Structure formats: C-alpha cells, structure tokens
C-alpha cells in the first residue's frame, strides 16, 4: 500500500479529471492551487507523475512545463519525459486532415455554438456550447458521415465528452501507459480518468493497481468518484499523508459497476 511503497506511478488525465470541463478548451487552464498540488505530489522522490491527455503538446508544456512530471499529448501520439524533448511515438500521417477537416467545418458552420480544435495529429469538433439536443443529434450524424467517408482511410473516429474526435489509429493511452509500466519496479500504481480514452489505460494496469473513473458509466476502473473535486481531495490527502495508514481511494469512493 501507499506508505510502504518504494516507487509509485501516477497516471493522470487532465480535462474532466483534475479540472471540470470548460466551455472552451483554452479556459480550462490549471489554477495555481492545482499546480501546487502537483508540485507537492512530485516532490516526493518515490513518486513518478505522468499526465496523459488528449491535449496538444504546446498547451501541455505551457501549462505544466514547470511541474516535475512526464507529459503525454494527443492520447499518446507525443511524449515528453522530464528533461527530454518531445518525441513522436511512431510515424503518423496527417494526410487525412485535408479530406476530413472540411467535413468538421461544415458541421461547425451548421450547428450554432460548435467549433473545431485542430491539433498536430488529431482534430475535434466540440459541441459543449450547442443546444444539447441539437448537438447530440449532430454528433451522431457527424460520426456516421466520418465513418462512411473514412472506410478506406486509416483513421479512428471517437465520440468523446461533448465532442467528436478524429485521430490516428493505434495510438491510445493504454499504449502510452505501458511505456512507464514496462520500466517496472513500481509497487504502487494509481490511474485516474473520466472517459473512454482512459479505459485504454485502465485496461493495461497490473492487477493490484488502483484505478478511478470520474463520473458514472461502465468502466474497467476499480473505483468511481463523482467529480474532479474528489480527485483533487484524494491527491491532496496523499500529499499530506503521515505514515502507517492503509491507502484507500477516498472514503467517498464508490463502485457503481
């Protein structure tokens, strides 16, 4: 358990996990309080922190470059270990962008309150600010259109949280997580995430690892909590811990599944 462990690995998602979702991705910048919390967690030499995000590398480096942690951008397409430059985990194509981004733009023009976020190896149509019913319906239509159009194109179409994402296949948080798990020697592993992209990470964890899904829904995680506030409380408690207590992910954690 936590106090007696010699090497600890934290695999943390960002949006919807450490912070609530914002109306626009750029508005979800971490507060100084959260950065201090991550600094406190990473200050323990036994702790290895990895931020696994769908975000682009520039945003992650701008927001978290000062924290002693490794960064994973675009669900695993790009990795930056502390002290090293960003690296592309495998050769990825962006040829699909010229064909598919116009489809996303059509929907962004057609559905009020929606917009596109283009990243290096992926693109997202966000509908968080749209009329809920109209946005949800359009998301299904867009997904169908993209799947039909991409039958012969090597890309993956994902329905995310109030978003539809197009990305390169064979890249996901499970593969990214294995990069650290394969190093071995971790006797405490904790993974926390909130959506289907995080399920890939939960699926590759060692049997005794702790996994927490934020929010309800079917999950591979061992525990579920209600909100990012619960996650921050948990991590804060770990920073402040004394010794000798048995680790349990939040007194308020529940197993819904």
What are these regions (language model features)?
Residues 114-133, 154-167:
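Charged, glycine-interspersed solvent-exposed loop segments at helix/strand-loop junctions
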Residues 9-11, 70, 190:
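Hydrophobic "anchor" residues on beta-strands that sit immediately upstream
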Residues 74, 80-98, 158-186:
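Substrate-recognition "cap/lid" segment bordering the active-site pocket of phosphatases
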Residues 55-74, 134-154:
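Substrate-recognition/cap helix-loop segment adjacent to the acidic, metal-dependent catalytic center
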Residues 5, 31, 169, 174-257:
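Mg2+-dependent phosphoryl-transfer enzymes with acidic/Ser/Thr/Gly-rich catalytic loops
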Residues 16, 71, 125, 177, ...:
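Residue-level signal for inorganic ion chemistry
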Residues 29-119:
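Active-site phosphate-binding/coordination module
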Residues 3-23, 51, 177:
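Asp-based phosphoryl-transfer active-site loop
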